[in-house]
Amino acid sequence: MTAAVFFGCAFIAFGPALALYVFTIATEPLRIIFLIAGAFFWLVSLLISSLVWFMARVIIDNKDGPTQKYLLIFGTFVSVYIQEMFRFAYYRLLKKASEGLKSINPGETAPSMRLLAYVSGLGFGIMSGVFSFVNTLSDSLGPGTVGIHGDSPQFFLYSAFMTLVIILLHVFWGIVFFDGCEKKKWGILLIVLLTHLLVSAQTFISSYYGINLASAFIILVLMGTWAFLAAGGSCRSLKLCLLCQDKDFLLYNQRSR
């Protein structure tokens, strides 16, 4: 039973991200490098936010329950803010690298910023999902474990779906964020930051897992639609994708008529 819970939750949380990696990134060495770099940037942001939280905890030096809760909220907000700052820093690094590649070799085709946004977002998401869920996932292997004592028996399942949402949201946030940077629409960056804060702070607002998960999925659908449009998607391109028909195939059919 515990093995089934472990593998089931693991595939729910990381299955889509693994599929995205295998089918869209694994065949391109350069994309793998950008993915690892994005994951590294997220790790550095986590390290800095952890140091800030630890310093705040040492300065306050109060172990009361309410104080610890406020420290946790403070740490969450600081972590989200630093993550988005590092997302912007990674964008600037990729932009400079792309411009440098064009100046050195004008004939070389640099990867598009939309592609880099997707790859970096997936790197952010995978690393975020691993750090947020791996401890919970390891607890599911405990002898006779169905849930955590005093909590919902569906805790592991909710956590798996929430990890899935966070990973995909990081992909969508990355695409929308880079698009806002490219167009110099700084309000878009603020929206990404606010939605990130909202999803991260849901557990402080409500203790009902079902409500938190439903609202997170709503944000996921909205951000996914926005990212699809920002990446140049349309109803026509979506239809062609679903029907497995590319542009050359359509032009050939039109010419034959």
From Swiss-Prot:
Membrane topology note: Multi-pass membrane protein
Pfam families for the chain: Aph-1 (PF06105)
Keyword Transmembrane helix carried by entry: yes
Keyword entries, A-Z: Membrane, Notch signaling pathway, Transmembrane, Transmembrane helix
Transmembrane segments: 5-25, 32-52, 70-90, 115-135, 158-178, 186-206, 213-233
Top-level taxon of the source organism: Eukaryota
Location of the protein in the cell: Membrane
Cellular-component GO terms for this entry: gamma-secretase complex; transport vesicle
GO biological process, one term: amyloid-beta formation
Gene Ontology molecular-function annotations: endopeptidase activator activity; protein-macromolecule adaptor activity
Subunit structure: Probable component of the gamma-secretase complex, a complex composed of a presenilin homodimer (PSEN1 or PSEN2), nicastrin (NCSTN), APH1 (APH1A or APH1B) and PEN2. Such minimal complex is sufficient for secretase activity, although other components may exist. Interacts with PSEN1 and PSEN2.
Function according to Swiss-Prot or TrEMBL: Probable subunit of the gamma-secretase complex, an endoprotease complex that catalyzes the intramembrane cleavage of integral proteins such as Notch receptors and APP (amyloid-beta precursor protein). It probably represents a stabilizing cofactor for the presenilin homodimer that promotes the formation of a stable complex. Probably present in a minority of gamma-secretase complexes compared to APH1A.
Family as reported in the entry's similarity comment: Belongs to the APH-1 family.
Protein name: Gamma-secretase subunit APH-1B
Species annotation: Pongo abelii
